[in-house]
Structure formats: C-alpha cells, structure tokens
Amino acid sequence: MSNLTVNVIEEKNLGDNKPCVLKFSQGLPPLSFIEKEPEFISMSTKNKRHRVVLTNTDQLEYESEDKDSKYAKYAIGIFDKNTKQLKIVPTKIQTMNQSVIGYTLTLDSSSVISREERYDKIKKLADSFGSKITKKKMQKMEMENVENLDYEKTTKSIDAVKNELADIESNEKPFDLPDFDAETNDVRKIYNIEAILPPRIFFGLNHQPFLDIISKTSEAPSYLPEYFKDQLKRFEDIKDEEKVVYNCKLLTFMWYSMILMKSKGGHEPLIKEGCTSEVINFLVSIFGSKINHKKYNISQDDKLKIYNYLAIFALKLEDFQITDIKSLAQSLSLTSSSFEKHFTRVGCKVVRIGSEKRSVRLEAPLKLPKARFSN
C-alpha cells in the first residue's frame, strides 16, 4: 500500500444517499428476516430511518435514534484495490430500537393505557436513560428468544383486552359492522381500515396481480367484474406509488371477500387467487364459521355483513363519495336499489337518480339506522 492515496468526501457532497451505520443493541435480526429482503425506508419529513422486516409469522419494526455526539464524528473507509485509493465517507451511527408492529391497533377505542403500551414506554425510557443493569433486565425479558420476541404472548394479551372490551360493548356494538367512531366529524376517521385489517393480514394480501394489470404486464382475467377493472383503470392516474399499492390491497380484500361469499364453503377458489391460508382463516373468522380446516359456512347474516364491509371499503377507495354504485352492485349480482340499503346501513346519505342510479356519501357524525336490512 505504498502508493495509497486518501480522498476525504465532504458531507455536503453526499446528496440524499448518505451512508448510515445501524447499531442493533437488542441483537441482530434473525437471518430468516434478512433473507426476506427487508425494506429500508428513508423518512424525508423526519430525521430518522425506519427498517421494517416482515414475514408471514413475525412482524418486527426497528426505529432508529441518532446517537451522534457533537464531540465525535464517524466515517466509513472504502478502499478501491484497482486505484489504491481510500475514500473516507462521513456517516452517522443509528441505534435501532426494536418493537412489535401493530400491537396497539385493537386498543384504539380504549382511553386506558394498555399493558403493552405501558411496557413499550418503559422499554424506550430504559433504552434511553436506564442504567446497564436496567437495560440488561429489559433485554432479558424481551430478547430471550429474538426470533419470537414474545409476539405470541403479546397477541394473547391483546386478544384478552379485546374480549373484555367486546363484553362491555356487546349490547351497543352492531355485529354486522366493524368498529366505528360515532362522535368524530371527520368521515375519514369513522371506520378505521387499519384496525379492520391487522398488519399481518394487510401485508399478507397478494395485491401483485392487480399491480401487474395496472402496469400492463398482464391482462385482467375475463371473469374479473367490471367494477374491479374500472378501479384499476382509475388507479393508473395516481402518481403516488404507495397510494396505488395501498388501494390495490384494499381492492384485493374486497375481491377475496366476494370469492369467500360465492365459493360454497371451500378454500380452493381463494387459493387459486393467491390468498394465503392465514388470510383465509381471518376472512372466515369475521365473515363465517369454520366447519373444518378446509370447509366453512357463510350464513345469510354473514352475507349481509360482507355487503356492509364492501360498501365501507368502496367508500374508502373513492374518498367516501361514490357517484354511481351500479358497477359494484352488479359485481355482486345485485341491483342498485337493493345494494343501496347497505350504504344506508353504514351511515351514508343516498341520492336516487332515476330507477337505477344511486349516488352515496358517508356523513359525519355517524348516524346509523335503527334496524338492519335483508336482501
């Protein structure tokens, strides 16, 4: 290395793609996560980076803290064997704090802080200000098995809290609707889609076939209802790629729900459309009753519930106001006059235009009809 030259890169010349050293103080993610090609997201609005790792069975989130000191600077040395040049690139040291994704979603309706939320606050305080002994105790509690991260225990605790809340609200909560906020004046907050679809289900929805249709890499199958083709055509004009993916996932959930209702109690039609067994079990848990590991039953009341959910998701896709519901109704083999009752059920104002055209708009605060409807 007698002819070694050193090139020091100034931080202002790095642009947006600045290198970063990630410090996993709670232990490195399991190799099984890394092999799944985890996604790195650089947050432009906040001085932080996120690393999200997802699999079918475990969901972990790493949120970083900037540990740089004003008294010390760090850099990465990159040596080029061909030119014998050593580049010195300034970098930041980011400590990645680990937590379970989605464990507070089912507790949004409660004003009382949950045990999981309290534990998470304590853990963050311990990581930031705790002594070495405190940090070791916290790590021992949570990191004895880094591949599980007590995810199963956390889920059971959440289910227990959810059941307690359900018992309290059972006399008031309609069984044919998801959880809702009847007090808000913002229509976007009445039905929380993120609470309806837990992260493990949302990320498990196979939206790729719809993305392929939008990008013209494949054609829409002939059996796909016109409503879905029209929505995908509309998505082509959306510039935000994340919004397109989000909408495709909601549309995928609607498609799976329709198939569930029409597939006569068998899993095969859903599996053919790329639906995982975990998503199938979730659909059956909210829309039907399980007979065995391959069969389920959908009652007439279950169908009414599916129609209500489809109305809510359709409203979400079109900013809570739909000019004409005819296409969606036809995809369910219903008339507009028949399907409009389900928009009324979820709290919409319906405007009738002629014999078949129906325009609907969700109104806030929510006012539900006193009686349910049947088709």
Swiss-Prot record:
Keyword Oxidoreductase appears in the UniProt entry: no
Protein family (similarity comment): Belongs to the eukaryotic RPA49/POLR1E RNA polymerase subunit family.
A Pfam cross-reference name: RNA_pol_I_A49
Protein role: DNA-dependent RNA polymerase catalyzes the transcription of DNA into RNA using the four ribonucleoside triphosphates as substrates.
Source species, domain of life: Eukaryota
A GO molecular-function annotation: DNA-directed RNA polymerase activity
Subcellular location: Nucleus, Nucleolus
Matching InterPro entries: RNA_pol-assoc_fac_A49-like (IPR009668)
Major subcellular site: nucleus
Subunit details: Component of the RNA polymerase I (Pol I) complex consisting of at least 13 subunits.
A biological process term (GO) from this entry: transcription elongation by RNA polymerase I
Record's GO cellular component terms: RNA polymerase I complex
UniProt keyword terms in alphabetical order: DNA-directed RNA polymerase, Nucleus, Transcription
PANTHER family, per database record: DNA-DIRECTED RNA POLYMERASE I SUBUNIT RPA49
Protein name, as recorded: DNA-directed RNA polymerase I subunit rpa49
